[in-house]
């Protein structure tokens, strides 16, 4: 018997799990009608032979920005085909396509130019973009998702795109930039700001009731009838509403809850599965975040994980003493205590730890903190870094010294 026969013969929960993923764009977007109409109005000159102003879309993660833009873009392409107009949309995720060269090469290749993804001078690629657009006479909407990532690493690409229309005769480009950061324009060069000529649309967070509507809509497409226990959707919506009204978080919670139920061979998705999903998502987020941290932040967290096994709360001074000793074991020079305080603030913002400033009376003030992550899970994630793997050899010694506050080897 095939090993999958038993799995496939069991009752299924999912009808189509892909509709719960971030990449899915639904046919309808509940509670974003105002933003859809606003964006459609701003892009409508494309269908009348004109060039719209550039558009910036702002809002926190999970507020429907990308889904709304892609929804309107799809409608724009459909309307242009009906009217037999030469209008195109090109989507670029600037977290992945993050250099001026790659942005321009991506655009050139979209319109038929055989530009390699590396190797040419950027100016040459820019000229190829112009030639490709002029050959086709295309009016293009360029969607730059996470545009703030591009601004930080390659703002000359944005400058090139903002000035390109003055060099085109038969075609044009409209930029639609999407960002979680409402202040990212503060980092733009003055020459880019002056050439942007942009409109802005702000996406507010969803509330619990709106998130519930979104989940109900997706659940009908994602699940077989009758597999969701009462209260599952409401709980997912309520938890996500606390996280700044994040629809992505709500959808992830519902999907992971169902996957947990599926793995447990349960025919229903229950409230208890949602609670397990919350813990799993938080752990996965923490592990992924830890993997991307610089080495000193990792050593700092390793120090905290050792102390916290017997002392859940600890101070900056206590952590710094252990941190310095670990730096010696890893073979890196320790940072100053002031810089370590900055790193602690960054870790606090990431949600890996929680810190408060407390008064020590005449001894001044210090920061008291506790880890929000399980120290064993945290240490396992940290030890994926080859530089920290050798610390396992000293774990017993380090724990003993950390817990006794005897910071000498």
From Swiss-Prot:
Record: residues binding ATP: 63-67, 206, 218
Keywords for the protein's UniProt record, in alphabetical order: ATP-binding, DNA replication, Nucleotide-binding
InterPro entries: AAA+_ATPase, AAA_16, Cdc6_C, Cdc6_lid, ORC1/CDC6, Orc1/Cdc6_arc, P-loop_NTPase, WH-like_DNA-bd_sf
Pfam family, one: AAA_16
Molecular function terms from GO: ATP binding; ATP hydrolysis activity
Signal sequence region: none
CDD domains with a match to the protein in the record: AAA, Cdc6_C, HLD_clamp_RarA
Gene Ontology BP terms: DNA replication
Coiled coil location: none
Family membership: Belongs to the CDC6/cdc18 family.
Functional note: Involved in regulation of DNA replication.
NCBIfam families: orc1/cdc6 family replication initiation protein (TIGR02928), PRK00411.1-3 (NF001625)
Protein name, entry field: ORC1-type DNA replication protein 1
Source species of the chain: Archaeoglobus fulgidus (strain ATCC 49558 / DSM 4304 / JCM 9628 / NBRC 100126 / VC-16)
């Amino acid at each position: 018997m095939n090993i999958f026969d038993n799995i496939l013969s069991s009752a299924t929960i999912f009808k189509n799990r892909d509709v719960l993923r971030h990449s899915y764009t639904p046919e309808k977007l509940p509670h974003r009608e105002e933003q859809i109409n606003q964006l459609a109005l701003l892009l409508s000159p494309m269908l009348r032979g004109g060039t719209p102003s550039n558009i910036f879309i702002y809002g926190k993660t999970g507020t429907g920005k990308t889904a709304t833009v892609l929804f309107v873009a799809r409608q724009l392409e459909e309307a242009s085909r009906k009217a037999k107009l030469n209008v195109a949309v090109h989507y670029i995720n600037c977290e992945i396509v993050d250099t001026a060269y790659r942005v321009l090469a991506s655009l050139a290749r979209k319109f038929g130019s055989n530009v390699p993804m590396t190797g040419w001078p950027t100016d040459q690629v820019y000229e190829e973009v112009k030639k490709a657009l002029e050959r086709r006479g295309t009016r293009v909407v360029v969607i730059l998702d996470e545009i703030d990532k591009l601004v930080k690493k390659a703002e000359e690409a944005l400058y090139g795109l903002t000035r390109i229309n003055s060099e085109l005769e038969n075609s044009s480009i409209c930029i639609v930039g999407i960002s979680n950061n409402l202040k990212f324009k503060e980092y733009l060069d003055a020459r880019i700001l002056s050439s942007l000529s942009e409109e802005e649309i702000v996406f507010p967070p969803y509330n619990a009731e709106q998130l519930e509507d979104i989940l109900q809509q997706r659940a009908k497409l994602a699940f077989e009838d009758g597999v969701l226990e009462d209260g599952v959707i409401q709980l997912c919506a309520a938890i996500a509403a606390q996280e700044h009204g994040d629809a992505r978080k709500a959808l992830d919670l519902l999907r992971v809850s169902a996957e947990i139920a599926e793995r447990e061979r349960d025919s229903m998705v229950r409230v208890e599965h949602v609670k397990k999903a919350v813990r799993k998502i938080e752990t996965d987020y923490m592990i992924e975040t830890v993997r991307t941290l610089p080495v000193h932040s990792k050593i700092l967290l390793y120090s905290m994980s050792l102390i916290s096994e017997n002392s859940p709360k600890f101070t900056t001074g206590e952590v710094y003493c252990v941190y310095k000793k670990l730096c010696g074991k890893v073979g890196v020079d320790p940072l100053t205590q002031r810089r370590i305080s900055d790193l602690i603030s960054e870790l606090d913002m990431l949600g890996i730890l929680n810190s408060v400033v407390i008064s020590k009376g005449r001894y001044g003030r210090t920061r008291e903190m506790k880890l929000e992550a399980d120290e064993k899970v945290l240490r396992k994630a940290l030890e994926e870094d080859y530089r920290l793997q050798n610390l396992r050899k000293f774990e017993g010694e380090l724990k003993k010294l950390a817990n006794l506050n005897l910071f000498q080897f």
